[in-house]
Structures are given as structure tokens and as C-alpha cells.
A protein has these predicted regions:
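Alpha-helical scaffolding segments of alpha/beta enzyme cores, especially the outer helices
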Residues: 71, 75, 135-138, 164-178, ...
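Alpha-helix N-cap and loop-to-helix initiation/capping positions
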Residues: 60, 64, 68, 127-128, ...
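Catalytic-face loop-and-helix region of soluble metabolic enzyme cores
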Residues: 223-277
Length: 277
């Protein structure tokens, strides 16, 4: 991160694609050390499932209401944003309610998810992403958010979905350039055509999917969010280190490592391996 005493020039920043609005967004979502310590509260499906399970434990068998989901997101933002550089929110439940309730501090950055949660899929179960209904990059910029986040599942070996996702990512990237707002792109591998996450064919190709996705897509963002290229305990540590080096080489932008739902000890080891590689 640049500071008044550094030698990083405006020309250098522009060469990295950091125009004034993007640079300001990066500063806003980082802490004083230039570290990204973001909290995600935009996961609608998993949050709805958690609230539904909580209600069942209380003997109430029903779907959570809009108000209950909003309340849960406000509680999360209030509790966790105090120790975060930024909070990631969704447009439907989170952004206005979290900000309007004054539970996101004025010194905490705000990122808004642009993609639709639980969008359509093709005949083999591969995602076909699109904008959150009623939302756009322009709207996210206009409400004063600091950055846009785009989650785009991507599988190079499934051409129908891959072509659709590629075009959608390009569109969001161009919109972010037009409106001068920072873009964080998150690509994830996915099972399709009857696979599950523990299916051997998915496990076997995941590392290559992660690396190839970075090679094709990392140019269309300012910060790239990548999955760990492999599985702890499946591939050897030496193979995983090789995969991480290939991922680093493939990514055309600074990248961060997604936790992708693993527990903290596993994620800690993944981060340590990524740093060493």
C-alpha cells in the first residue's frame, strides 16, 4: 500500500490499473497496514439454512422471514465489523439494512456482491451467472460502496457455462472500469453432470481448474480471489507447492486465498503453504 513516504508514483499506479476511484476503494477496504481483513455477510443460501436449522431446534418448522434474515445480517455486521477492514454485503438483504442501522462503522469499507445468488444452471448443472435482480455496477457505485465483488463459478472443461461466465465477467469488469470502482473477482470450481464435491473426477481436476481459471480470468479484475489448488491430504505437499507456484504464475493480478469453507486449521496451513510457495 502506498504511503506519503513511498516512491510509488501515480504513473505506476495507473500502470497497475488503479485509477483514482479504484485506488480509493482499495484504501477503504484495507487496514492501516495495507492488509485486507474483510468479513463476508453476503452468503444468502447458507445463512437461510442456518436460520432454518435454528428454528427447527426451537420446534418451529418453517422458512425464515425476510426480517429474520435481515436481523441476522445486522447482528453479524455489528459483531464482526469492529475488527474488520471491510464488510461484504448483498444488495437484497444486507447493504441498506446494515448501513442504515449504523452497524458498519464509518471507517469500515463496504463491498457489495453483484451476482445473483442461486442463479440458473444449464442441463448438466453448470452455473449461468447474472446480475442480482435490480442491481448493477452503476447502482453499487452510486450508493457509495467502495468495491464490487463478483463470484463466478468457472469450469474450463464445460464450454457452455464457461463461455457464458467468461462474457459475464468481462461485462462486469468493463462496467467497473467505466464507473471507476474496484473489482474483486472470485472464481470457484464446481461439480457438474452428476458429480459431487467428493467425486473422484472433481477432486482430480480441481487443481487444474483453479490454475486455468486464473490464467483465463484474473486479468478481468483488480484483486483476484482464488481457491486452494488441490486438497490437503490428497496430493502431496510437494505437489501442492508446485500447484501454488503455477497459480501465482498464472494470475495476472494480486491474489488472495479463499477459505472455501474449510476449517481454520486447514485454512491456516493452506495460507502458510501459499506464502512459502
Amino acid at each position: 500500500m502506498s504511503n506519503p513516504g513511498s516512491k510509488i508514483s501515480a504513473t505506476r499506479l495507473l500502470g497497475l490499473g488503479l485509477t483514482c476511484g479504484k485506488l480509493r476503494g482499495l484504501q477503504r477496504i484495507s487496514n492501516d497496514n495495507g492488509t485486507l481483513t474483510m468479513v463476508a455477510t453476503d452468503q444468502n443460501s447458507s445463512m437461510i439454512t442456518m436460520i432454518r436449522d435454528s428454528l427447527k431446534k426451537k420446534g418451529v418448522d418453517r422458512e425464515p422471514t425476510y426480517e429474520e434474515i435481515v436481523e441476522a445480517k445486522i447482528i453479524l455486521a455489528s459483531a464482526l465489523s469492529k475488527n474488520a477492514s471491510a464488510v461484504l454485503v448483498d444488495g437484497y438483504y444486507g447493504v441498506w439494512n446494515s448501513i442504515g442501522s449504523f452497524n458498519i462503522g464509518k471507517n469500515v469499507g463496504v463491498l457489495v456482491r453483484v451476482e445473483q445468488s442461486g442463479g440458473p444452471k444449464n442441463k448438466v448443472g453448470a452455473p449461468l451467472g447474472g446480475f442480482e435482480p435490480g442491481w448493477s455496477v452503476a447502482k453499487i457505485k452510486n450508493i457509495g460502496a467502495d468495491a464490487v465483488k463478483l463470484l463466478a463459478p468457472f469450469e474450463p472443461t464445460e464450454p457452455h457455462s464457461a463461455e457464458h461466465q467468461y462474457e459475464f465477467i468481462q461485462q462486469v469488469y468493463e462496467d467497473c472500469k467505466k464507473h471507476d470502482i474496484l473489482l474483486l473477482l472470485e472464481t470457484v470450481a464446481f461439480p457438474f453432470n452428476g458429480e459431487k464435491k467428493d467425486t473422484k473426477s472433481f477432486i482430480d481436476r480441481k487443481a487444474e481448474t483453479v490454475i486455468e481459471s486464473a490464467r483465463q480470468l484474473s486479468r478481468f479484475c483488480d484483486i483476484y480471489k482464488a481457491e486452494f489448488p488441490g486438497h490437503l491430504g490428497v496430493e502431496s505437499d510437494s505437489q501442492l507447492e508446485k500447484n501454488l507456484k503455477e497459480l501465482d504464475k498464472a494470475s495476472e493480478r494480486p491474489w488472495v486465498l479463499l477459505s472455501a469453507g474449510v476449517d481454520f486449521p486447514a485454512y491456516k496451513k493452506q495460507v502458510e503453504m501459499a506464502v512459502q510457495a
